[in-house]
Curated annotation (Swiss-Prot):
Binding site for substrate: 91-95, 145, 189, 216
Homology family: Belongs to the queuine tRNA-ribosyltransferase family.
Top-level lineage group: Bacteria
Note on how the cofactor is bound: Binds 1 zinc ion per subunit.
Residues at the catalytic site: 91 (proton acceptor), 266 (nucleophile)
Biological source species: Leptospira borgpetersenii serovar Hardjo-bovis (strain JB197)
Co-factor(s): Zn(2+)
Listed HAMAP family: Q_tRNA_Tgt
Pathway involvement of the protein, from the record: tRNA modification; tRNA-queuosine biosynthesis
Single Gene Ontology MF annotation: metal ion binding
Name of this protein: Queuine tRNA-ribosyltransferase
């Protein structure tokens, strides 16, 4: 058992827990920064350790293509290659099948694709992506799945479920024959069709995965459908295992995920938005490129304790963004990841204190507005 619930909210499905990944213990709900190619863009492993992150995400598809499994094997895995000393989760490449669909072709037992880099041809199967993730050295491996677009026809959604379930069974069979210290998570699909979602959840929960993931949400569907599916599946999840909502990381989405029992989140938005000049604060979102911050001598967030806010003014960081200095990206990214760390900590404390809905309302009010106006 890698997961233990430590407290539960009495009015929602929100809970706190401990996730134990080969000796690295994490408090949940937890947010994972995304290091697609083996690094969280613009910041170092030292920064992540200073920020006290213990779990990051890497991408199997991209790491398989570059630097490639031969290099990773030579170094003893991504963690030794990058000197990352804590835990690592890798996705399987299933989402890249969805997002780069024109370059891929599904087959019965896998997916053929062309590299987006040089056009070379490759083939992923449920077994091969487990082997690749083992070479990467993942603490949590995700199974290969078929993520259909949310607006797919019933026929396409049915294909997605059948393929996802077949590949999940193949993954479990292969994994159990060749177990190591890695943990395997299953993924359920179904688009925005609640009936298919529940069918897929039932199937994936029936298999001996270490954790369960919600795939194919927050991929462009209307927000009301995102909420409807979260609420619809919440009562049927297996509370003995961690629940991971893949690719989700906005403040409102995390709040609704936690409310419905989600334990784990990842998303590129805190880091991508930082590079585009949007930062998260205790007062709401701020666009650093806005002219009104040009002469401001206050920090990004007067209530933030990160080293960026302790040292630099918002006017200075705006200037760096305005002239295209790379330091703007690293400073803004550091701040946003500090914010996310503290935000999840506040959520955990509110659940433990029986005040989650109070925190839920506070942050929803702040982050459903377009931008803090100053």
């Amino acid at each position: 058992m890698i997961f233990q619930t430590t407290s539960e909210d009495l009015r929602t499905r929100a809970r706190t827990g401990i996730l134990n990944l080969n000796g690295v213990k994490l408090e949940t709900p937890v947010f994972m920064p995304v290091g697609t190619r083996g690094v969280v863009k613009t910041i170092s492993a030292d920064d992540l350790e200073e920020l006290e992150y213990s779990l990051i995400l890497g991408n199997t598809y991209h790491l398989y293509l570059r630097p490639g499994t031969a290099v990773l094997e030579r170094f003893g895995g991504l963690k030794k290659f990058s000197t990352w000393k804590r835990a690592l989760l890798t996705d399987s490449g299933g989402y890249q099948v969805f997002s780069l669909n024109s370059l891929f072709k599904y087959e019965q037992d896998g997916v053929r694709f062309q590299s987006h880099i040089d056009g070379s041809r490759h083939y992923f199967t449920p077994n091969s992506v487990i082997d690749i993730q083992r070479t990467i050295g993942s603490d949590i491996m995700m199974v290969l799945d078929d993520c259909a677009p949310f607006d797919s026809s019933q026929e396409r959604l049915r294909q997605s479920l059948d393929r996802t379930h077949r590949w999940a069974e193949m993954s479990v069979e292969y994994w159990e024959k060749n177990k190591n210290s890695s943990h395997l998570f299953g993924i359920f699909q179904g688009g925005i069709d609640l009936g298919l979602r529940l069918e897929s959840l039932q199937k994936i929960v029936s298999l001996p995965f270490d954790g369960i993931a919600i795939g194919g949400l927050s991929v462009g569907e209307p927000r009301k459908d995102f909420i409807r599916i979260l609420e619809g599946v919440s009562a049927y999840t297996d509370r003995s295992r961690p629940l991971y909502l893949m690719g989700v990381g906005t403040v409102p989405d995390i709040l609704d995920g936690v409310k419905n029992g989600v334990d784990m989140f990842d998303c590129v938005l805190p880091t991508r938005n930082a590079r585009n000049g949007q930062v998260f604060t205790s007062l709401g979102k701020i666009n650093l490129r806005n002219e009104k911050w040009k002469s401001s001598d206050v920090p990004i967030d007067p209530h933030c304790g990160c080293k960026v806010c302790k040292r630099y003014s918002i006017g200075y960081i705006r200037h760096l963004h305005h002239v295209g200095e790379l330091t703007a990206f690293s400073l803004s990214t550091y701040h946003n990841l500090y914010f996310m760390k503290n935000f999840l900590s506040e959520i955990r404390k509110s659940i433990q204190a029986g005040e989650f809905l109070k925190i839920y309302a506070k942050w929803k009010n702040l982050y459903e507005k377009p931008e803090f106006s100053g």
